């Protein structure tokens, strides 16, 4: 019987990051049914987007893999919300689907500290000393001090094509049949969630001349600062549904397993199927769809926004009702997948089970949707699992300093009754935790945790010294009686416009130039946000002794009930109670100010 510090079950985006992070300082095994499926992108061939790119930049800052994989295999990059402020600007990178998985497998299989074990997990058994045995379906037993379960959509997975279903974790791959049982046996409340994927269409059957072309940004961007050589090679395109599309869907809703009642699982609110869009937004006469290549030389394109569980024969008619797709040939049909998830409020903020100490969960098993959310959780769970195995101090990531902290807080303290998607609107301090400064915020933590080496830390420190030098250069020069930073603060001026006036900057990378521009243009807003955050930090020490929580009308019912039951002594303790949300903490602070009860607990 072999043993490791950490065993990771699953090789998707969560499992990959968990193994990579844990292997920085522990012995790791990854249990997968088929090593050739590691790192696959089963849905859209892209990384990033609003709320998601911020997570990827943070994973990168903490020594993770996703940003590196995305940059290495990029074929199209765009900054979304570029006309808006830096708090919501988000990078989206289109990837070569097969190359992404191949690169992930190359890295994982080539790591000397990671053993890849082929098999299906059937059971989890405690060893009586704080560790675990992972038992496979063929009877093998593997020992680990900590286990990360990153099973994706595979736990009792069922795929649906119309009213026809079959046991699969995703198309063509068997489900994890037994892994739900030990979790349920321990008392975990399991729920059924559902997600879906669009059809893939033969590229040579599409009339691209009839589509709106969306070029890549002329200056490719990346998560690592080093986008791959093909990062601007391919455009994407846009089409839309038609009245005929909507008519076909409305007349055939009985063929949908969701609307026929066959699927009990809840689907993602922010990534609805095309059936849901037509039904829920019946007042819209069209829905925009994005046509994305699976690679530069691929024979397939992906219909972003057209996920469906309708029967294949109907999918043919639906796709051919779209402009540019009149002669389309579907190579892979859309489908829905239903699967088990745990109740994330039964986890700690390190994603460790409260019911099974030493068992960590990450990714879609925790009720999230998206590659980026999975990768972020994988990094946390893998790091925490390794630190537990080696009896090191627990990992702590703050909501106030990262999207990652918001994700953990939301999952564990709030929970979700539907697949959770990270969005910029969930983040209270988004002007402080931007995608452009993730390395500045988190590199030091990465070094402390053993995830980032000191050479990387020195490079980040040097980067921000150059940024500071750039800002000082603007402040020290004058043209027409005004300093460069004053010119740059004008809404109509970009950094290039300031340089055109004659201001000289030191040599800076594109990322450093962006950092200079953001810090100058938004200095007042950023300083105000930092003062607000500092005030909130001080407020966490305020005493709640004697507060009548039941009389505070602005609290949510759940928060009022839990605060009355737990009776926390400080605002910080109240913030740590599951079900007490950020809005409830704000309501408590308003109440304390109104009543004059602002003493600190000492």
Curated annotation (Swiss-Prot):
Record's function text: NAD-binding protein involved in the addition of a carboxymethylaminomethyl (cmnm) group at the wobble position (U34) of certain tRNAs, forming tRNA-cmnm(5)s(2)U34.
Protein name: tRNA uridine 5-carboxymethylaminomethyl modification enzyme MnmG
PANTHER family, A to Z: GLUCOSE INHIBITED DIVISION PROTEIN A (PTHR11806), PROTEIN MTO1 HOMOLOG, MITOCHONDRIAL (PTHR11806:SF0)
Binding residues for NAD(+): 267-281
Swiss-Prot/TrEMBL keywords: Cytoplasm, FAD, Flavoprotein, NAD, tRNA processing
Quaternary structure, from the entry: Homodimer. Heterotetramer of two MnmE and two MnmG subunits.
Source organism of this protein record: Deinococcus geothermalis (strain DSM 11300 / CIP 105573 / AG-3a)
SMART domains documented for this protein: GIDA_assoc_3 (SM01228)
InterPro entries given in the database record: FAD/NAD-bd_sf, GIDA_C_N, MnmG, MnmG-rel, MnmG-rel_CS, MnmG_C, MnmG_C_subdom, MnmG_C_subdom_sf
GO CC annotation terms, alphabetical: cytosol
Domain of life: Bacteria
Cofactor(s) for this UniProt protein: FAD
Family of the protein in this entry: Belongs to the MnmG family.
Region (Disordered): 217-242
Keyword Cytoplasm found: yes
Coiled-coil portions: none
Any one GO biological process: tRNA wobble uridine modification
Amino acids binding FAD: 10-15
Subcellular location: Cytoplasm
GO terms assigned for molecular function: flavin adenine dinucleotide binding
SUPFAM superfamilies linked: FAD/NAD(P)-binding domain
